[in-house]
A protein has these predicted regions:
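Short acidic, hydrophobic short linear motifs in intrinsically disordered regions
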Residues: 25-38
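Short alpha-helical segments that sit at the start of domains
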Residues: 1-18
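Short, amphipathic alpha-helical "recognition" segments used to contact nucleic acids or chromatin
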Residues: 18-26
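Long, low-complexity, charge-rich intrinsically disordered regions
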Residues: 1, 83-199
């Protein structure tokens, strides 16, 4: 029988599997391949596959003993249809001293967006790190000196996971601006999304 249709959002592990599918640029993504790349237990991966299957956007099938996921949609269309299930990876945001920046952090927010589009960079540099690697108690809510502080986003998953440079990956970056009302940012996000999914 058909699995119940998904209402609500993907859990973050499913979102990562979805991103892996988008970035793999292949029609079929073998679950065993995904298991090698994603930092999940086998059980978490199985759940993520099941959740993708409940969306009608993916087909889960087997070739011999190898399970795979496949979508009938092109990447740009798939992303548009999946947007209702996707969430911003940003769990918390605050400020830290510039001296606290580590190599586990990558550019994110407006800083990363301005590197990849026509958007002018904001004065305060934004970084991201997985919430697992950073104690949120160390964030301050107040920006006192933009020359001495940076903005830090704590993400639900590692912003380096799909990154190809020193910034968070493009699609997660797009998702991190889900709640923006700034037209300049919306334009830049659209530009980045379009370019990334046309490839």
């Amino acid at each position: 029988k058909d699995p119940p249709k998904l209402t609500g959002k993907f859990v973050y592990s499913t979102q990562q599997l979805f991103l892996l599918y988008l970035y793999s640029k292949k029609k079929r993504l073998y679950i065993s391949e995904a298991g090698k790349v994603l930092p999940f237990t086998a059980m978490t991966l199985t759940r993520a596959v099941k959740q993708l299957e409940t969306t009608d956007l993916f087909l889960v099938a087997k070739e011999g003993v190898n399970k795979f996921i496949e979508s009938k949609y092109k990447r740009d269309e798939l992303f548009e249809k999946a947007k209702v299930y996707l969430t911003t990876p940003v769990r918390k945001t605050g400020y830290i001293d510039k001296t606290q920046v580590t190599e586990n952090m990558v550019f994110a927010g407006e800083t990363a967006l301005s590197e990849k589009t026509m958007l002018n960079p904001s004065r305060v540099v934004t970084y991201a790190i997985s919430e697992k690697y950073y104690d949120k108690a160390l964030l301050t809510d107040e920006l006192i000196d933009p020359d001495k502080q940076v903005r830090l986003e704590l993400w639900a998953y590692n912003p380096k996971q799909f990154s190809e440079d020193n910034s968070a990956d493009d699609i997660s970056l797009v998702l991190s601006f889900t709640d923006t009302n700034d037209e300049r940012i919306e334009e830049a996000v659209d530009e980045l999304q379009e370019r990334r999914l046309q490839e």
